[in-house]
Amino acid sequence: MVCKALITLCIFAAGLRVQGSPTPTLLPVSLTTKSTAPMATWTTSAQHTAMATTPVASATHNASVLRTTAASLTSQLPTHPREEAVTSPPLKREVNSTDSSPTGFSSNSSGIHLAPTPEEHSLGSPETSVPATGSQSPTLLFSQGPTSASTSPATSPSEPLSASVTSNHSSTVNNIQPTGAPMAPASPTEEHSSSHTPTSHVTEPVPKEKSPQDTEPGKVICESETTTPFLIMQEVENALSSGSIAAITVTVIAVVLLVFGAAAYLKIRHSSYGRLLDDHDYGSWGNYNNPLYDDS
């Protein structure tokens, strides 16, 4: 048990030395790792976005090797003095691989720590192989954050690395996750999908505001019915001028005077006192009460 722990510590120290050593040459494959607080983005140049994928059999073999190594190192090295916080502030790193061979990718020589979640493989993005090499044996580097721990496995030379290529030359790098290792909280594919979210909100059609007439037609009809007499009176007042109003007033007064004058004339014509008496009765008492009587 102690021997296994010592061997594991030696392998871990050798990996740290190789990782800390500067790369001797710069190759055309340049991966720029840009980390933000909630998510991470990996971009690659346009000329290396399409490469042939490696066979599935080698990936299966390497995955089994990584499972065994991860299981042994998880039980022996839960906490190591060299830790990297997963939730560290945003940082930017440029990583250059050491070989142009398209057979695999080495994270020990270039210093890449990739730990994508399994949901990256279920998104159905096109996969391409990024060329990188390494002669180091598979080594697991544990990085424990304040709340969760993530494992960045170093892949063997024959392990494929899949990348999701987009139109703006940004790709999401996916790596094989061992079974016994915890998953990293940040997912490059989630950042890729969230980068398109504002555009969907921007292009979303704005709902048309409805006018009060469209929303409440019944209310508008009731208001028009209640205000109909007022509108008619306003129209009549606007149609009649001051001269027309004066003419109507004079006509009404003339008709009233004519009616009362005709009634008075007819009253006088048909007196209630009756006719005057005959000559032999003219001086009688019956003619004194008659105003038409003249006794002079």
Swiss-Prot record:
Induction per the UniProt record: Induced in prostate, after castration. This induction is reversed by androgen supplementation.
Cytoplasmic side: 266-296
Membrane among keywords: yes
InterPro entries, sorted: PARM1
Keyword Phosphoprotein annotated: yes
Region span, Disordered: 73-220
Tissue expr: Expressed in prostate. Detected in other organs at low levels, these include the heart and various tissues of the urogenital tract. Not detected in mammary gland.
Post-translational modification: Highly N-glycosylated and O-glycosylated.
Membrane-spanning ranges: 245-265
Keywords: Cell membrane, Endosome, Glycoprotein, Golgi apparatus, Membrane, Phosphoprotein, Signal, Transmembrane, Transmembrane helix
GO cellular component: early endosome; endosome membrane; Golgi apparatus; Golgi membrane; late endosome; plasma membrane
Domain of life, per lineage: Eukaryota
Glycosylation site positions: 62, 96, 108, 168
Biased composition (Polar residues): 125-145
Signal peptide from the UniProt entry: 1-20
Topology of this chain in the membrane: Single-pass type I membrane protein
Phosphoserine modifications at: 284
Segments of skewed composition (Low complexity): 97-111, 146-175, 195-205
Extracellular topological intervals: 21-244
Pfam families: PARM
Subcellular location: Cell membrane; Golgi apparatus membrane; Endosome membrane
Family the entry assigns: Belongs to the PARM family.
Database matches in PANTHER family: PROSTATE ANDROGEN-REGULATED MUCIN-LIKE PROTEIN 1
Protein known as: Prostate androgen-regulated mucin-like protein 1 homolog
Taxon lineage: Eukaryota, Metazoa, Chordata, Craniata, Vertebrata
